[in-house]
Amino acid sequence: MGKHDRSNDTQSVDIYSSAKRKKKAAKKGKKNKRSKTQKIIITILSVLVGFCILVSGLLIFALNYFDYNKTDLDEDLLGAQLDDSEDHVKNIALFGIDTRNQESMTGLSDSIMIMSIDSKAKTIKLVSIMRDSVVRVNGKVNKINSAYSTGGHERAIKTLNENFVLDITDYATVNFSGMIGLIDMVGGVEAEVTKNEFYRATAYGSLNDLIKEQAKLMGLKNPELVDAPGKQMLTGIQAVAWSRIRMQATAEGERDDYGRTARQRHVLKELFSRAANMSVTKYPKFIKKLLPYVETSLSYKEIIKLAPAIKGGTLESERIPYENTLIKGHTGVSAGLYYNLDYASELIKGFIYDGKTFETYVAENPIDKTPWIE
């Protein structure tokens, strides 16, 4: 073999060795990148797990340390009917009692909502049921809000389940006056106060007159009043007074009871959004403030299980009856809202389980106005 051939062989070995080294270096680089990525993922997961443990710990502490109005339900009396319900979706009946007395949990349910918590999708959906809705209550045609006053939370839940084919087995009753302190804790809620709402909130006076009325019931001498109409931050007492307005239209044009429930949903959505972004360390104080004004069948373990979805979830809302679904006809119920209950049931289930807004569902399925009262 000549000198030139040996040189070529040496060069080939060098090229091979160099390629091998580069390949090893590339593998090492990829390994290091994977290692760094894995470390980042592990770190993030550790933080999230730690956060969840911290939140759960604070909730356990708060719910054990502070008394709350826990009640037990007889599930045989609730009429739960939905066979195709999903394990990761929890439906809860929410009843709002607007008595002006912050400590009362009795009376007509001024607002009725179905709160659906999807722990998998991390969504919370609210469906408001108008209190003047004509339904069957204990076998008789009546307004839906009569169920709570005549048979308590069990009859009210049964009425929702039987008329809208649902699987509700838990509830929470909230005294809306008790929301005042919670709203103040989160720094208030943003709302747009129209000129009519500001100057002529009721037949008897302005929004500030409503605020003064609420303050008098609470023993407050100098409540903070609203200075002018427009978009602004409302304090707790201002927001609760604003949510009670029925006479005037909202900024979106909704009137009467439609407007009132729209304001209530807005206040609840704002409160939820601000509470969800609140520092975890403030949770015990927030819960302590909330619990005296809530009566619920949920145990503290169930509340803790739902907490992650509430903390990181998004909130969407709809209202029953949906626009243009009312039926003209005699119901025997004065000033009742008469609509097809089967169609309303499908609207609700499409929203909760399929993620379809009412607008989307109606576009795909023509409105059914078939009367059901003979």
Labelled PLM ranges:
Residues 82, 102, 133-142, 281, ...:
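C-terminal solvent-exposed extensions
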Residues 150-218, 297-299, 318:
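Amphipathic, coiled-coil-like alpha-helical scaffolding segments used for oligomerization/assembly
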Residues 95, 101, 132, 159-167, ...:
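Structured segments of extracytoplasmic/periplasmic soluble domains
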Residues 109-111, 141, 153-161, 176-180, ...:
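Extracytoplasmic/secreted envelope proteins and their assembly/folding machinery
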Residues 87-90, 107-112, 121-129, 139, ...:
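Extracytoplasmic
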Residues 2-6, 11-14, 27-122, 244-245, ...:
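Entry/capping segment at the start of metal-dependent catalytic domains
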Residues 105, 184-279:
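Flexible, polar/acidic helix-loop-strand segments at domain edges
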Residues 101-104, 142-150, 165-170, 229-230, ...:
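Second-shell loop/turn segments in exported
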